[in-house]
Amino acid sequence: MSVKVASPFSPDGVQCLPKLFTISAPAGAGKTTLVHMLQEEFPSAFEKTVSSTTRSPRPGEVHGVDYVFMSEDEFKDVLDKDGFLEWVFLFGTYYGTSKEGISRILQKGKHCIAVIDVQGALTLKKQMQTVAIFIQAPSQEELERRLNTRDSEKDLQKKERLEHSNVEIAAASQFDYVVVNDDLTTAYQVLRSIFIAEEHRMSHG
């Protein structure tokens, strides 16, 4: 039996089937902040699946909240057991999206948000029905400025991420929606409107 979710955007409580939304962006584009804002406003309707990674936690990151931090052996063990819906090796680090994590959220009747890299989002889009959203900084210069505020990353890591961002931005046309994060408040309203439009489409067939 399918579990439905009551739309937080509809005054008459129209219900629809929960759906998987993927949100991707170059490092520094602001995807984490935007997703946090969405969860804060609509905690009963949306839940973010927690990705697994073999990188070390950054200052302020919490295991099980921001990421499931694993050793390489632990990650490969889950991989061998076919526990990831998608995974990628990027910048010397493994990242993966848990099958169980997504399934658990959808079965609770909540929309699932997966904050994953571009390659992972496009992989999921081929495997199942998703709404793929790409967050983009207004310019490469602004992206570089935001990355330079991250004390947790070394210069080489920042350079690699900037170079990789060109590949990610080139793939933006393959996503269902592109949101330019020039102003955080405006970008959030655009993101919010995407969820409203998708819920309306799902509830009205």
From Swiss-Prot:
PROSITE patterns: GUANYLATE_KINASE_1, GUANYLATE_KINASE_2. Keywords: ATP-binding, Cytoplasm, Kinase, Nucleotide-binding, Transferase. PANTHER family: GUANYLATE KINASE, GUANYLATE KINASE-RELATED. It comes from Chlamydia muridarum (strain MoPn / Nigg). GO terms for cellular component: cytosol. It is found in: Cytoplasm. Its main location: cytoplasm. HAMAP family: Guanylate_kinase (MF_00328). ATP binds at residues 25-32. It comes from the Bacteria. This is Guanylate kinase. It catalyses: GMP + ATP = GDP + ADP. Its EC number is 2.7.4.8. Essential for recycling GMP and indirectly, cGMP. Residues 18-196 form the Guanylate kinase-like domain. Belongs to the guanylate kinase family. The gene is gmk. GO terms for molecular function: ATP binding; guanylate kinase activity. Pfam families: Guanylate_kin. InterPro entries: GK/Ca_channel_bsu, Guanylate_kin-like_dom, Guanylate_kinase, Guanylate_kinase_CS, P-loop_NTPase.
